[in-house]
Amino acid sequence: MEALLLGVGLLLGAYVLVYYNLVKAPPCRGLASLRGRTAVVTGANSGIGKMTALELARRGARVVLACRSRERGEAAAFDLRQESGNNEVIFMALDLASLASVRAFATAFLSSEPRLDILIHNAGISSCGRTREPFNLLLRVNHIGPFLLTHLLLPRLKTSAPSRVVVVSSAAHRRGRLDFTRLDHPVVGWQQELRAYANSKLANVLFARELATQLEGTGVTCYAAHPGPVNSELFLRHVPGWLRPLLRPLAWLVLRAPRGGAQTPLYCALQEGIEPLSGRYFANCHVEEVPPAARDDRAAHRLWEASRKLAGLGPGEDAESDEDSQPEDPGTPSSPSSPHPEEPTVSELYPSPQSSTDRSTVTCRIPVKAELEPQAC
């Protein structure tokens, strides 16, 4: 009996340690008014993105849910309007796997929205699933698509300054190692998928770092945010069906709810006084140091140039000139199978070699304005 009680005690103690070190996220306690401001959140039809959009809507922002599925995106927009009491929540179609869709979204947004104060790159994938593309789908969705979208929306971000870009990354970036000779090569097999996912998250951190350098003095700041281990659709999406019933209870016990995962992205989007930390990586609502590979400025700049090529941006092409080369129907950016005519192929970009966690109790203390009723995140 004593051994049993000791075992139970050890298990409970272990769970408490896991809960307070991984599951429980520092809450975002303040509520700044965002009336008159516009935010775009990608992948906002579920999980962290939906919770992030909800908190922005509660603060009075006009929130654009940029999602691939029209049905799920419009349903999420309806839910968020009902829950937040804010009718300024809308859906716009965006498929980050298609550069044509990214360009079409940008055209539609720039033609209809006079402001962009917050851009949150939340959408992402952890596996290619059964899709077999002639490019690195994980890098395309998790980095290249967001890179192009940011580039195309920069004119609006600059005219709305001070404004912010938040790139949702992951602690997996610590395992990433970028090989610039194979950056966009197709991913085959689960081992390559794990490596490609970590690499895409490293690309997120380097992108935020270089973007901060590129935008210094413009009033646009950017941050990489780690939401923590979250019990979301991304976690279970690629788990075999027979295993999901077994993993769901475990995930509920040891992973954060999406609402908890939204706290650090919200902190990066809203916290006053962190502008001097533009380009840094945040976790648990505080800045966190990254490994050498994630603070390599030369690699960050090299990734920037490689990303321009992969996104179909020519030398010297600026954001304003990109707006002139959009698909003919900007209102329906939903075709993932119609590549932009200028998209380069992998062989063109990369010829063959022969041819040449400290757990902080820091909270998001955002000044409260009188326009909205206070609600904790």
UniProtKB/Swiss-Prot annotation:
Residues reported in the UniProt entry to bind NAD(+): S46, I48, Y197, K201, S232
Family per similarity comment: Belongs to the short-chain dehydrogenases/reductases (SDR) family.
Organism: Bos taurus (Bovine)
EC number(s) on file: 1.1.-.-
Pfam families, A to Z: adh_short
Protein name, as recorded: Dehydrogenase/reductase SDR family member 13
Active site residues per record: Y197
InterPro entries the UniProt entry points to: NAD(P)-bd_dom_sf, SDR_fam
Biased composition (Polar residues): 352-363
Binding positions for substrate per the UniProt entry: S170
Single GO MF annotation: oxidoreductase activity
GO cellular component: extracellular region
Bias (Acidic residues) ranges: 317-327
Xref: SUPFAM superfamilies: NAD(P)-binding Rossmann-fold domains
